[in-house]
Amino acid sequence: MAAPLIRSRSNAVVRRFRALKERSGGDLALLEGTKLVEEALAAGATVTEVAASPRAGRMPRGRALLEALDKRHVPVSLMHEDVLASVSEAETSQGVVALARRPVFAEETMLARDPLLLVAVGIQNPGNLGALLRAAEAAGATGAYLAEGCADPFSWKALRGSMGSAFRLPHLRRVGARETLKRLDARGVVTVAATSSGEMQYDQVDLTRPVALVLGNEGAGLDPELLAAASARVAIPMRGGVESLNVAVAAGVLLFEAARQRRR
């Protein structure tokens, strides 16, 4: 028997989804769209509940996802398009939203072998943070530390930017930046800070060792104490009148330089 179509925004299921939309944090994340739900499932995330419009079930990809969820015994509620739009963060609902448990990662997993780490400080823009995590995973990073002032990696915009990397790339949130650098130094990890005033160019430092790349936001960058605490400070040379790069772009440059050196 088909599930009844939810038409009221006061329905208990709708209120449950809306509560997470309006209050980020906690143990659950709100996922939007077929692709992101697929990525979460593939990463082994626990999807606890799904809401979908009838339109999603008529599309081949949406139908396949709903069948996969049914096999996993994940509760699926059908919602009228207007009702589903009320729990969606997107301007245009993609027809599927889900609740999933946020993964919990262990630091030892990040440090287990040949660490290539990222330390992000004050990355407030969720889209930039998501893109940064995506670049880190693509370059083969073993983990990331998200220090003071960073956006929630499981907010809608961050998840859209990372496209599932937040579920796969081990990371720790709300860590102290200075304490993290000290702890990494004690573990034999070289910390390399990105700054326009770096004493060497990014491709002149040895990134084949256990290393953590430290980046701040585009506006403020890293504070002097953090820069002083790092093992090395590197700059990305730029031409023309360009003074800085988007932090995810800068991270990508450094991460893929590390990947290049490690392939030699």
Q: What are these language model-derived features?
A:
Residues 64-89, 172:
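A glycine-rich helix N-cap at a beta->alpha junction
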Residues 1-67, 150-151:
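Boundary-proximal intrinsically disordered activation/regulatory segments immediately upstream
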Residues 33, 124-132, 243-250:
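Amphipathic alpha-helical repeat scaffolds
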